Structures are given as structure tokens and as C-alpha cells.
């Protein structure tokens, strides 16, 4: 069983005695910074020169500095920049400006697990990773609740890394729900596998193949869209609420019976073997090496794959159908319809 921690297991004053620099102000960065501030922590945000997020952070009343300036002021540096940017950011702006005995806090273990960032042995290195998007982390905190977090320690140079990690987790509201003890390796490998085999890669491919199967058989694309993509939210919401059993309880007997007899025909043992191969690439570093090499080259493979996905017929059909959905309101003002680019 996993080891769990709650508010009573952490001393908030530990992080309140520190000066914290949150590097990055995206989905997680803004939630961490605001929750820390509202928990009485001395926090500043480190952003690159010209960052579009500067005004947003300043409008929230946060102190905003360049990354080197923020790091120089801090006892705790929270690295929440995208995985592919962390290595360069750490080498150029963070590492040269670290104070002795600084604690590094990560929201994901990628760069530590695969060795792209190698902190010196005198630093504490911890991870506090909420299991939800930043807007939910912030909203739950404001409402007096919290999103569960996973907590790990990679280096404990001072002997106080766990105490600080739990204090930090409490400050962002995570221990109101629960903190789950893990390792950088476990978090990274399970997170990447889940994204690739199920949550992103697996589901996206399954939906596209379902759409292609129906339209190639002569069914209307609009009807196919409803059956394989639109209604997916209804099923996922039921799973989210009560697991697979709750989903099966909620659907018709016809749908439940079809689940049992046809699901294994589509997702057969070969799929599990393919999943095991994906996991192996995550474990041995092959995926990480491929991703970082492509990013270092300007991301040509990434751009090609993204463009291919955007050009799939289901995207055009969906754009037109969603115009009919008065109940669906765009939640991201900076999103361009039909594009995965950020």
C-alpha cells in the first residue's frame, strides 16, 4: 500500500521560513505561486525577459523577477518550465545563481530521471506534483479543499528534504486531500506510460480508428463523430466518478454486454504486448532520448506529427459540429480552434 500524508503530518512553518522562487507561470506555476502566497510563504516568480506571463503574474500581486534574480533571492527553487526547456534553463540561469543548500522542487521527474539535469550533491532535490491541472489546484485551494499530490525525495543533503517537501505540499493545498509517497523514477515512468499508452496516445488513436472504420463503411462523418468522440466524455466522467464498474452500471444492458464481448476483440492481448514495448522504451530512456534529440534539432518530427494529427478528417467534422453546441463554451482564450500548437 502507498504511504499517505495529510495536513497533520506537515509543519507549514518550514516553508514559511524560506524564500521561494517559482520558475514559470503556466498552468502549474500560477497555481503553486498563488497558493504558496496565500499560505503565508515569501514567494517570487522567475520569468525570462519579455515573457507574456509577466503582466498576468504582476496583476495577481506577485513579485516578478528574471530567472537569475529570482534564484539568487531564494532558498527554494521550484522548476515548472516545460520538460524540454528545463535543461537549458537550469544550466544557463539557475545553477550559476543557486545559494548553498538550496532545495530544488520539481513538478515532474523527467529531467532528473533521465539525467538531463544533474544537481550537485549539496542540494536537496524533491518533487511535489499535484495530480490535476493548475486551474483545478488553484480552485480547490481557494474553496478550502485540495488536489492530491505525489511527493518524492531524490537527494537529501541537509537531512530535512522530506520535512520541506511535505511542508511545501501542505502550502499548495495538496495534503488537504492526500500526499502519496513515490520516487522520481516511479512518477516519471508511470506518467509517461499513462500519457502514451492510454490517456493521450491510446485514446486518440482509438478514436481516430473508430471514426475511420465507420466513415469508410459509408456512415455519415457527423454521426461517427458523435459515436466515437463526443460521447467519450460521458463515459470518462462516469469512470472518473466511480471507476469502470460505475460506468457499466450506468449504461444500458446492451452497451454493457457489448463491452464484455467486443472490447477484448478490439483491445486484444497484442495491445498489451505493445503497451509493454512502450513501457520498455520509457524505462530504458529511448523515448526520452528521441524526444530531446528532436527538440534540440528544432522539433521537426514533432511538427510533422502534430500537422498530421491536425489534418485528420475528424478535426474538421468536429469544428463544424461544435458550433451547434451552445452548452460548450471555450475555456481557453488563447487556444486556436483546430490547432495543437502552443
Curated annotation (Swiss-Prot):
<keyword id="KW-0100">Branched-chain amino acid biosynthesis</keyword>
<protein>
    <recommendedName>
        <fullName>Ketol-acid reductoisomerase (NADP(+))</fullName>
        <ecNumber>1.1.1.86</ecNumber>
    </recommendedName>
</protein>
<feature type="binding site">
    <location>
        <position position="252"/>
    </location>
    <ligand>
        <name>substrate</name>
    </ligand>
</feature>
<comment type="similarity">
    <text>Belongs to the ketol-acid reductoisomerase family.</text>
</comment>
<keyword id="KW-0479">Metal-binding</keyword>
<feature type="binding site">
    <location>
        <position position="191"/>
    </location>
    <ligand>
        <name>Mg(2+) 1</name>
    </ligand>
</feature>
<dbReference type="InterPro" id="IPR013116">
    <property type="entry name" value="KARI_N"/>
</dbReference>
<dbReference type="InterPro" id="IPR014359">
    <property type="entry name" value="KARI_prok"/>
</dbReference>
<feature type="binding site">
    <location>
        <position position="53"/>
    </location>
    <ligand>
        <name>NADP(+)</name>
    </ligand>
</feature>
<dbReference type="GO" id="GO:0050661">
    <property type="term" value="F:NADP binding"/>
</dbReference>
<dbReference type="GO" id="GO:0005829">
    <property type="term" value="C:cytosol"/>
</dbReference>
<feature type="binding site">
    <location>
        <position position="191"/>
    </location>
    <ligand>
        <name>Mg(2+) 2</name>
    </ligand>
</feature>
<keyword id="KW-0521">NADP</keyword>
<dbReference type="InterPro" id="IPR008927">
    <property type="entry name" value="6-PGluconate_DH-like_C_sf"/>
</dbReference>
<feature type="binding site">
    <location>
        <position position="195"/>
    </location>
    <ligand>
        <name>Mg(2+) 1</name>
    </ligand>
</feature>
<comment type="pathway">
    <text>Amino-acid biosynthesis; L-valine biosynthesis; L-valine from pyruvate: step 2/4.</text>
</comment>
<feature type="binding site">
    <location>
        <begin position="83"/>
        <end position="86"/>
    </location>
    <ligand>
        <name>NADP(+)</name>
    </ligand>
</feature>
<keyword id="KW-0560">Oxidoreductase</keyword>
<dbReference type="GO" id="GO:0009097">
    <property type="term" value="P:isoleucine biosynthetic process"/>
</dbReference>
<feature type="active site">
    <location>
        <position position="108"/>
    </location>
</feature>
<feature type="binding site">
    <location>
        <position position="231"/>
    </location>
    <ligand>
        <name>Mg(2+) 2</name>
    </ligand>
</feature>
<dbReference type="InterPro" id="IPR000506">
    <property type="entry name" value="KARI_C"/>
</dbReference>
<feature type="domain" description="KARI N-terminal Rossmann">
    <location>
        <begin position="2"/>
        <end position="182"/>
    </location>
</feature>
<dbReference type="InterPro" id="IPR013023">
    <property type="entry name" value="KARI"/>
</dbReference>
<feature type="binding site">
    <location>
        <begin position="25"/>
        <end position="28"/>
    </location>
    <ligand>
        <name>NADP(+)</name>
    </ligand>
</feature>
<dbReference type="GO" id="GO:0009099">
    <property type="term" value="P:L-valine biosynthetic process"/>
</dbReference>
<comment type="function">
    <text>Involved in the biosynthesis of branched-chain amino acids (BCAA). Catalyzes an alkyl-migration followed by a ketol-acid reduction of (S)-2-acetolactate (S2AL) to yield (R)-2,3-dihydroxy-isovalerate. In the isomerase reaction, S2AL is rearranged via a Mg-dependent methyl migration to produce 3-hydroxy-3-methyl-2-ketobutyrate (HMKB). In the reductase reaction, this 2-ketoacid undergoes a metal-dependent reduction by NADPH to yield (R)-2,3-dihydroxy-isovalerate.</text>
</comment>
<feature type="binding site">
    <location>
        <position position="51"/>
    </location>
    <ligand>
        <name>NADP(+)</name>
    </ligand>
</feature>
<dbReference type="Pfam" id="PF01450">
    <property type="entry name" value="KARI_C"/>
</dbReference>
<dbReference type="InterPro" id="IPR036291">
    <property type="entry name" value="NAD(P)-bd_dom_sf"/>
</dbReference>
<comment type="pathway">
    <text>Amino-acid biosynthesis; L-isoleucine biosynthesis; L-isoleucine from 2-oxobutanoate: step 2/4.</text>
</comment>
<feature type="binding site">
    <location>
        <position position="48"/>
    </location>
    <ligand>
        <name>NADP(+)</name>
    </ligand>
</feature>
<feature type="binding site">
    <location>
        <position position="227"/>
    </location>
    <ligand>
        <name>Mg(2+) 2</name>
    </ligand>
</feature>
<dbReference type="Pfam" id="PF07991">
    <property type="entry name" value="KARI_N"/>
</dbReference>
<keyword id="KW-0460">Magnesium</keyword>
<keyword id="KW-0028">Amino-acid biosynthesis</keyword>
<dbReference type="GO" id="GO:0004455">
    <property type="term" value="F:ketol-acid reductoisomerase activity"/>
</dbReference>
<feature type="binding site">
    <location>
        <position position="134"/>
    </location>
    <ligand>
        <name>NADP(+)</name>
    </ligand>
</feature>
<feature type="domain" description="KARI C-terminal knotted">
    <location>
        <begin position="183"/>
        <end position="328"/>
    </location>
</feature>
<dbReference type="GO" id="GO:0000287">
    <property type="term" value="F:magnesium ion binding"/>
</dbReference>
Amino acid at each position: 500500500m502507498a504511504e499517505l500524508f495529510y495536513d497533520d503530518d506537515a509543519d507549514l512553518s518550514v516553508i514559511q521560513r524560506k524564500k521561494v522562487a517559482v520558475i514559470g507561470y503556466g498552468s502549474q506555476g500560477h497555481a503553486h505561486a498563488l497558493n504558496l502566497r496565500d499560505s503565508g510563504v515569501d514567494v517570487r516568480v522567475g520569468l525570462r525577459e519579455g515573457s507574456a506571463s509577466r503582466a498576468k503574474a504582476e496583476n495577481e500581486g506577485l513579485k516578478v523577477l528574471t530567472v537569475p534574480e529570482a534564484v539568487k533571492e531564494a532558498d527554494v527553487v521550484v522548476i515548472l518550465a516545460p520538460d524540454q526547456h528545463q535543461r537549458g534553463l537550469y544550466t544557463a540561469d539557475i545553477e550559476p545563481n543557486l545559494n548553498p543548500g538550496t532545495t530544488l522542487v520539481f513538478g515532474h521527474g523527467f529531467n532528473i530521471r533521465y539525467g538531463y539535469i544533474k544537481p550537485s550533491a549539496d542540494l536537496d532535490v524533491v518533487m511535489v506534483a499535484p495530480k490535476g491541472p493548475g486551474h483545478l489546484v488553484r480552485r480547490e485551494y481557494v474553496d478550502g479543499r485540495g488536489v492530491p499530490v505525489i511527493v518524492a525525495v531524490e537527494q537529501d543533503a541537509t537531512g530535512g528534504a522530506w520535512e520541506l517537501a511535505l511542508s511545501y505540499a501542505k502550502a499548495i493545498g495538496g495534503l488537504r486531500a492526500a500526499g502519496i509517497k513515490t520516487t522520481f523514477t516511479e512518477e516519471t515512468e508511470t506518467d509517461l506510460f499513462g500519457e502514451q499508452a492510454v490517456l493521450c496516445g491510446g485514446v486518440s488513436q482509438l478514436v481516430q480508428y473508430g471514426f475511420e472504420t465507420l466513415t469508410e463503411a459509408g456512415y455519415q462523418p457527423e454521426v461517427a463523430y458523435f459515436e466515437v468522440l463526443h460521447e467519450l466524455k460521458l463515459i470518462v466522467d462516469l469512470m472518473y466518478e466511480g471507476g469502470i464498474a460505475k460506468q457499466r452500471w450506468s449504461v444500458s444492458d446492451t452497451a454493457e454486454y457489448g463491452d464484455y464481448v467486443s472490447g477484448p476483440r478490439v483491445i486484444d492481448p497484442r495491445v498489451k504486448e505493445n503497451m509493454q514495448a512502450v513501457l520498455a522504451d520509457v524505462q530504458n530512456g529511448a523515448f526520452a532520448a528521441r524526444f530531446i534529440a528532436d527538440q534540440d534539432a528544432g522539433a521537426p518530427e514533432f511538427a510533422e506529427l502534430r500537422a498530421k494529427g491536425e489534418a485528420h478528417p475528424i478535426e474538421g467534422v468536429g469544428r463544424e459540429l461544435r458550433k451547434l453546441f451552445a452548452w460548450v463554451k471555450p475555456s481557453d482564450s488563447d487556444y486556436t480552434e483546430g490547432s495543437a500548437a502552443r
